[in-house]
Protein backbone atom coordinates (compact mmCIF):
# COMPACT_ATOMS: atom_id res chain seq x y z
CA UNK A 1 0.00 0.00 0.00
CA UNK A 2 1.26 3.49 -0.80
CA UNK A 3 2.51 5.33 2.28
CA UNK A 4 0.37 8.42 1.54
CA UNK A 5 -2.76 6.26 1.51
CA UNK A 6 -1.76 4.68 4.82
CA UNK A 7 -0.99 8.15 6.19
CA UNK A 8 -4.41 9.48 5.16
CA UNK A 9 -6.12 6.50 6.79
CA UNK A 10 -4.21 7.20 10.00
CA UNK A 11 -5.18 10.87 9.87
CA UNK A 12 -8.83 9.94 9.28
CA UNK A 13 -8.74 7.69 12.36
CA UNK A 14 -7.08 10.45 14.37
CA UNK A 15 -9.75 12.97 13.33
CA UNK A 16 -12.50 10.54 14.32
CA UNK A 17 -10.79 9.93 17.67
CA UNK A 18 -10.39 13.66 18.34
CA UNK A 19 -14.00 14.43 17.41
CA UNK A 20 -15.22 11.62 19.66
CA UNK A 21 -13.08 13.12 22.44
CA UNK A 22 -14.79 16.50 22.08
CA UNK A 23 -12.23 18.33 19.95
CA UNK A 24 -13.31 20.68 17.18
CA UNK A 25 -11.31 20.14 13.99
CA UNK A 26 -10.23 23.48 12.53
CA UNK A 27 -8.06 22.33 9.64
CA UNK A 28 -6.41 19.30 8.11
CA UNK A 29 -3.16 19.21 6.19
CA UNK A 30 -2.36 22.89 6.62
CA UNK A 31 0.61 23.67 4.39
CA UNK A 32 3.02 26.56 4.28
CA UNK A 33 6.53 27.09 2.97
CA UNK A 34 7.73 25.90 6.39
CA UNK A 35 6.01 22.53 6.34
CA UNK A 36 2.70 20.80 6.98
CA UNK A 37 0.52 20.22 10.01
CA UNK A 38 -1.64 17.11 9.89
CA UNK A 39 -4.48 18.33 12.11
CA UNK A 40 -5.27 21.62 13.82
CA UNK A 41 -7.99 21.32 16.42
CA UNK A 42 -9.44 23.15 19.38
CA UNK A 43 -9.88 21.64 22.83
CA UNK A 44 -11.65 23.81 25.40
CA UNK A 45 -10.22 27.00 23.89
CA UNK A 46 -6.72 25.61 23.38
CA UNK A 47 -5.36 25.35 19.84
CA UNK A 48 -3.99 21.84 19.42
CA UNK A 49 -1.42 21.11 16.72
CA UNK A 50 -1.44 17.38 16.01
CA UNK A 51 1.17 15.27 14.25
CA UNK A 52 -0.13 11.83 13.28
CA UNK A 53 2.10 8.80 12.83
CA UNK A 54 0.94 5.27 12.11
CA UNK A 55 2.58 1.87 11.67
CA UNK A 56 1.48 -1.71 11.35
CA UNK A 57 3.68 -2.91 14.21
CA UNK A 58 6.31 -1.79 16.68
CA UNK A 59 8.92 -4.18 15.31
CA UNK A 60 11.13 -1.27 14.29
CA UNK A 61 10.03 1.14 17.00
CA UNK A 62 6.99 3.19 17.83
CA UNK A 63 5.57 5.61 15.25
CA UNK A 64 6.27 8.69 17.37
CA UNK A 65 9.97 7.81 17.50
CA UNK A 66 10.23 8.85 13.85
CA UNK A 67 9.61 12.49 14.77
CA UNK A 68 13.06 14.04 15.01
CA UNK A 69 14.24 17.51 16.04
CA UNK A 70 14.11 18.75 12.46
CA UNK A 71 10.46 17.68 12.09
CA UNK A 72 9.54 19.29 15.43
CA UNK A 73 11.12 22.59 14.35
CA UNK A 74 9.17 22.45 11.06
CA UNK A 75 5.91 21.81 12.92
CA UNK A 76 6.58 24.71 15.30
CA UNK A 77 7.45 27.13 12.47
CA UNK A 78 4.37 26.06 10.53
CA UNK A 79 2.20 26.48 13.63
CA UNK A 80 3.58 29.98 14.22
CA UNK A 81 2.81 30.85 10.61
CA UNK A 82 -0.72 29.43 10.95
CA UNK A 83 -1.42 31.48 14.09
CA UNK A 84 -0.13 34.63 12.40
CA UNK A 85 -2.02 34.00 9.16
CA UNK A 86 -5.29 33.29 10.98
CA UNK A 87 -4.70 36.21 13.39
CA UNK A 88 -5.08 33.95 16.41
CA UNK A 89 -3.91 35.72 19.55
CA UNK A 90 -4.23 35.11 23.25
CA UNK A 91 -4.95 31.38 23.03
CA UNK A 92 -2.97 28.56 24.52
CA UNK A 93 -1.25 26.33 21.98
CA UNK A 94 -0.47 22.67 22.58
CA UNK A 95 1.49 20.21 20.46
CA UNK A 96 0.23 16.63 20.52
CA UNK A 97 1.17 13.43 18.75
CA UNK A 98 -1.31 10.74 17.84
CA UNK A 99 0.45 7.43 17.37
CA UNK A 100 -1.46 4.59 15.74
CA UNK A 101 -0.26 0.99 15.84
CA UNK A 102 -2.52 -1.74 14.44
CA UNK A 103 -5.60 0.48 14.87
CA UNK A 104 -4.69 1.22 18.51
CA UNK A 105 -4.59 4.96 19.11
CA UNK A 106 -2.21 6.54 21.60
CA UNK A 107 -2.64 10.25 22.27
CA UNK A 108 0.47 11.98 23.57
CA UNK A 109 -0.54 15.40 24.85
CA UNK A 110 2.04 18.18 25.24
CA UNK A 111 4.59 16.15 23.28
CA UNK A 112 6.71 19.28 22.83
CA UNK A 113 6.30 23.04 23.12
CA UNK A 114 7.31 26.27 21.40
CA UNK A 115 10.58 26.35 23.35
CA UNK A 116 11.69 23.00 21.92
Swiss-Prot record:
GO molecular function annotations of the record: nucleic acid binding
> Which residues span the membrane?
none
Q: Which Gene3D superfamilies match?
A: 3.40.1350.10
- Leader sequence range is none
Entry-linked Pfam families: UPF0102
Among InterPro entries, the record links this protein to: Restrct_endonuc-II-like (IPR011335), tRNA_endonuc-like_dom_sf (IPR011856), UPF0102_YraN-like (IPR003509)
Record family assignment: Belongs to the UPF0102 family.
Q: HAMAP family annotated for this entry?
A: UPF0102
Q: Which PANTHER family match?
A: UPF0102 PROTEIN YRAN (PTHR34039:SF1)
Enumerate the NCBIfam families for this protein: PRK12497.1-3, YraN family protein
Full protein name? UPF0102 protein PERMA_0362
Lineage at the top is:
Bacteria, Pseudomonadati, Aquificota, Aquificia, Aquificales
Amino acid sequence: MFSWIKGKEGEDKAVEYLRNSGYRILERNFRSRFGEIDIIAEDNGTIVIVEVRSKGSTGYGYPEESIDHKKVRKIIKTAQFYLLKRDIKGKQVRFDIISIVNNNIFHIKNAFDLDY
